[in-house]
């Protein structure tokens, strides 16, 4: 039988959601801009000092279950923005809060929630159109440095390193961020490849915050077989465990008792292992597995060759400097295969490209060639303390993701100016019903980033907005870093268009959802929960 449930309705439901939204957003928005503050998060090992919006938001859980629903919804804004762009989470959270606060005021005064939501959607779409039309493609190193520097909280060292990394491996190349063994932060290019297969289970994650599995000095078992028996795996697991080395398993699948045994030993801490399904299909899969084997110095354990997993020796395992696996992809850095073998394999693939009879086949072969020949830029981050290292790596990751977003969709003027100037594009939306309320809610929200950046810099937001409004130059704004009003685009204050666009869309989506909510339902715990005005069933 299901347990008791608590229900709240109408205005009370929306107020509870708003309280949760405000507690998350008020904590996160103090970090916005170059003068934003830091937040210290208590951890079991050592505290984390950060100004990263999504990292802060993820740590917040509220005692009141109804308020916690609102907190979870606005945390989703930050997380979705992070997942798609890697940056802009604070702005997205701030926009969502503003839309929800203004929306609830109007709905309480009698506006129709559904029509208000339609107005918000229309205004967000019009603003996105403006963002796309003002975007400038990224074609030079200076823009890369500017984007990366701003996303790294104005750390020019990080901006320069990311720019150099992109120069070495290309705009779409692979870039990895690792811990340095010294205090210095450095850049190196090593052999590596990436393929589109993630871990078979979250049990294998080593970093719960980033949801990735990462191991250094890792052995690699490659097979085209399904692994279902524990017995066939025991020899290879004992071999790597005796050396204290982690193991990456690339197989057709790992299932049944073999999978259960891996999970149990990972949880107990007896094994450091990650398993992924082999990339590709059919004959392509066999060829890709052979590519990985040559890059890492492994031998593919194949039934066609009469080989068995329980007979694997150390010689047949590949080796890599670092492996990093998330839910969607696997990155192998510093494969220790022989250089001559890799070159011979690339020559073979090139000859296959030359005689391929279809464009599809040529493209697939070119991808394989790029994977084998393309290096991975490794940025090794150094710091004096563990706390400083974590914070610096977070900023490095933010900057890297923002820079990739800038390469994809270009850049727009930063400092909140693009969103502010998008307000003019909403004047064309003429509605006679409550949709116009939704449009006015978005107009107000689009001012909030400037107001908050100004507030975090110790000046009045309304004063900054008034000065910006006086100027016809669409790039004119307040540079919070220098305290000067100037052309922000010319002076390198820019944002990736993709970050601004997705943050606004996610904020509008969650705001519309909360504003049209009428009922909240949550579990009722007789021992812990106090009876309130909520209905209990």
Curated annotation (Swiss-Prot):
UniProt keyword list: ATP-binding, Chaperone, Cytoplasm, Isomerase, Nucleotide-binding
PROSITE patterns noted in UniProt: CHAPERONINS_CPN60
Keyword Isomerase: yes
GO biological process: protein refolding
Enzyme Commission code(s) on record: 5.6.1.7
Subcellular locations according to the entry: Cytoplasm
Lineage: superkingdom: Archaea
SUPFAM superfamilies (UniProt xref): GroEL apical domain-like, GroEL equatorial domain-like, GroEL-intermediate domain like
Coiled-coil ranges per UniProt: none
Top enzyme category: isomerase
UniProt family annotation: Belongs to the chaperonin (HSP60) family.
Job description of the protein: Together with its co-chaperonin GroES, plays an essential role in assisting protein folding. The GroEL-GroES system forms a nano-cage that allows encapsulation of the non-native substrate proteins and provides a physical environment optimized to promote and accelerate protein folding.
PANTHER family referenced in this protein's UniProt entry, alphabetically: 60 KDA HEAT SHOCK PROTEIN, MITOCHONDRIAL
Complex formation: Forms a cylinder of 14 subunits composed of two heptameric rings stacked back-to-back. Interacts with the co-chaperonin GroES.
Protein name, per record: Chaperonin GroEL
UniProt gene name: groEL
């Amino acid at each position: 039988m299901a347990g008791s449930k608590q229900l709240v309705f109408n205005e009370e439901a929306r107020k509870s959601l708003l309280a949760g939204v405000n507690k998350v957003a008020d904590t996160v928005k103090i970090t916005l801009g170059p003068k934003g503050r830091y937040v210290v998060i208590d951890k079991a090992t050592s505290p984390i000092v950060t100004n990263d919006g999504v990292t802060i938001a993820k740590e917040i859980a509220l005692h009141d279950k109804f308020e916690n629903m609102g907190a979870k919804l606005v945390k989703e804004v930050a997380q979705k923005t992070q997942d798609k762009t890697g940056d802009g989470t604070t702005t997205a959270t701030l926009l969502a809060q503003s839309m929800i606060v203004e929306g609830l005021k109007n709905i309480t005064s009698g506006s129709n929630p559904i029509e208000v939501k339609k107005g918000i959607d229309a205004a967000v779409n019009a603003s996105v159109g403006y963002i796309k039309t003002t975007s400038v493609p990224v074609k030079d190193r200076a823009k890369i440095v500017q984007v990366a520097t701003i996303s790294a909280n104005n750390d020019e060292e990080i901006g320069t390193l990311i720019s150099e990394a992109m120069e070495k491996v290309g705009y779409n190349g692979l870039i990895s961020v690792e811990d340095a063994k010294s205090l210095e932060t450095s850049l190196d290019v090593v052999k590596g490849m990436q393929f589109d297969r993630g871990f078979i289970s979250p049990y294998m994650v080593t970093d719960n915050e980033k949801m990735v599995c990462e191991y250094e000095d890792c052995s690699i078992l490659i097979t085209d077989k399904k692994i279902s028996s524990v017995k066939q795996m025991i020899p290879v697991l004992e071999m790597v465990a005796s050396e204290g080395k982690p193991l990456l398993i690339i197989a057709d699948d790992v299932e049944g008792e073999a999978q259960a045994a891996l999970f149990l030993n990972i949880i107990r801490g007896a094994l450091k292992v990650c398993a992924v399904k082999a990339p590709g299909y059919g004959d392509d899969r066999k060829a890709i597995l052979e590519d990985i084997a040559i890059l890492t110095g492994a031998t593919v354990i194949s039934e066609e060759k009469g080989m068995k997993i329980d007979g694997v020796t150390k010689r047949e395992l590949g080796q890599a400097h670092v492996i990093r696996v998330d839910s969607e992809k696997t990155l192998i850095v510093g494969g220790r295969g022989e250089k001559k073998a890799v070159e011979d394999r690339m020559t073979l693939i090139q000859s296959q490209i030359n005689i391929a009879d279809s464009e599809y086949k040529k493209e697939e072969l070119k991808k394989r060639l790029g994977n084998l020949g393309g290096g991975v830029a490794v940025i090794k981050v150094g710091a004096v303390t563990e706390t400083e290292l974590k914070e610096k790596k977070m900023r490095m990751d933010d900057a890297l993701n923002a820079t990739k977003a800038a390469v994809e969709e270009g850049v727009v003027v930063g400092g909140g100016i693009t969103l502010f100037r998008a307000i003019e594009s909403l004047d064309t939306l003429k509605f006679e019903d409550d949709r116009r309320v939704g449009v006015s809610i978005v107009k107000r929200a689009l001012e909030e980033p400037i107001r908050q950046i100004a507030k975090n810099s110790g000046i009045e937001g309304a004063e900054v907005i008034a000065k910006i409004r006086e100027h016809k130059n669409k790039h004119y704004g307040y540079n919070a870093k220098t305290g000067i009003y100037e052309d922000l685009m010319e002076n390198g204050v820019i944002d990736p268009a993709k970050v601004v666009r997705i943050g606004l869309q996610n904020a509008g989506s969650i705001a519309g959802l909360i504003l049209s909510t009428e009922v909240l339902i949550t579990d009722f715990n007789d021992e812990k929960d106090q009876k309130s005005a909520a209905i209990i069933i």
